[in-house]
Amino acid sequence: MARMYARRRGTSSSVRPYRKEAPEWSNTDATEIEKIVVDLRKDGMSTSQIGLVLRDRYAVPDVKLATGKRIGEILREKGLESEIPEDLRNLMEKALGIRKHLAENNKDVHNKRQLQIAESKVRRLVKYYVRSGRMPKGWTYKPETAEILLTR
C-alpha cells in the first residue's frame, strides 16, 4: 500500500525486539525511573527526549517494560502532561516554519504544497485527539493562534 503524501510504498526498517520483560542488564527500579522521568520533564524535556535520555544515560531500553507504564502515563499521573500532544506540537511548529518561509518567498510553490500537507496532517491529528478526549471538544487548528499556543 502506498503512502498518503508520497508516490512510494512503505520501506522496511529495523524493528524493536519483542520482549515481555526487561533485559537483566537494564535498570528496573520503577520508583527511581519515575522520579527521573519527572525530573527530566521539569527540566523542560519532551516525552521523546526523556526516552532517549533514559536509554542512553540510565540503561532503560523500554520504560513500559521496566515500570509497567508509558512515559506519558507517568506524566499524566503526576500532573505534568503537556496540554498539546508532542506529535501535534511538532507538526504545528513545522507548519508555522513553512508559513514564515512563504511570507518572505511567496512564489515558492513546492513549499506551498508542503504547507498544505503539514496542515492536513495537523487537522487529521486534531480530529483524532478531540474524538479520543485528549483535546477539548470544538478545538480547531488556526495558524494565527497556533504560534501563541506554542510559545506557552
UniProtKB/Swiss-Prot annotation:
Region (Disordered): 1-24
UniProt GO molecular function: small ribosomal subunit rRNA binding; structural constituent of ribosome
Keywords: Ribonucleoprotein, Ribosomal protein
SUPFAM superfamilies with a match to the protein in the record: S15/NS1 RNA-binding domain (SSF47060)
Pfam families from the UniProt entry: Ribosomal_S13_N, Ribosomal_S15
Residue stretches of biased makeup (Basic residues): 1-10
Presence of keyword Ribonucleoprotein: yes
CDD domains: Ribosomal_S15p_S13e
Family: Belongs to the universal ribosomal protein uS15 family.
Summary of subunit composition and partner proteins: Part of the 30S ribosomal subunit.
Protein name (database record): Small ribosomal subunit protein uS15
Species of the source: Methanoculleus marisnigri (strain ATCC 35101 / DSM 1498 / JR1)
